Curated annotation (Swiss-Prot):
NCBIfam families assigned to the protein according to its UniProt record, in alphabetical order: PRK00132.1
Keyword hit for Ribosomal protein: yes
Highest classification ranks of the organism: Bacteria, Bacillati, Bacillota, Bacilli, Bacillales
Name of the protein described by the UniProt record: Small ribosomal subunit protein uS9
Gene3D superfamilies xref list: 3.30.230.10
PROSITE patterns (alphabetical): RIBOSOMAL_S9
GO process terms (BP): translation
Length: 130
């Protein structure tokens, strides 16, 4: 018999994560690798686990993720967003918990573009009085 799966897509900066939740024992697989090996920073691993901790479903689902684009922080944020959306499909009662934790909101902050005449987005060239 076909196994029940819940899908969610998460985005952050230039990263896109396609997340599948499958009832299991709590493994997190990102791009075919265990997430302890994929994400090198403990703080970002905690970011990925936030939706599961908030809804108290940490050992209930295996999380299978395909993520591309961006760096570690963007990918971790995209995975968190995707897991939150998939959990919402699994059980709509999680909406209030996830919403209060701010996990359903797409983080719209992006890198500001560099402007001409400036060294960076806002940094001006050094000013000389004489």
């Amino acid at each position: 018999m076909a196994q029940v799966q819940y899908y969610g897509t998460g985005r952050r900066k230039s990263s896109v994560a396609r997340v599948r939740l499958v009832p299991g024992e709590g493994r997190v697989i990102i791009n075919g690798r265990d997430f302890e090996n994929y994400i090198p920073f403990a703080a970002l691993r905690e970011v990925v686990k936030q939706p599961l901790v908030a809804t108290e479903t940490l050992g209930n689902y295996d999380v299978l993720v395909n993520v591309n684009g961006g760096g570690y922080t963007g990918q971790a944020g995209a995975i968190r967003h995707g897991i939150s959306r998939a959990l919402l499909k699994a059980d709509p009662e999680y909406r209030l918990t996830l919403k209060r934790a701010g996990l359903l909101t797409r983080d719209a902050r992006m890198k500001e573009r560099k402007k001409y005449g400036l060294k960076g987005a806002r940094r001006a060239p050094q000013f000389s009085k004489r």
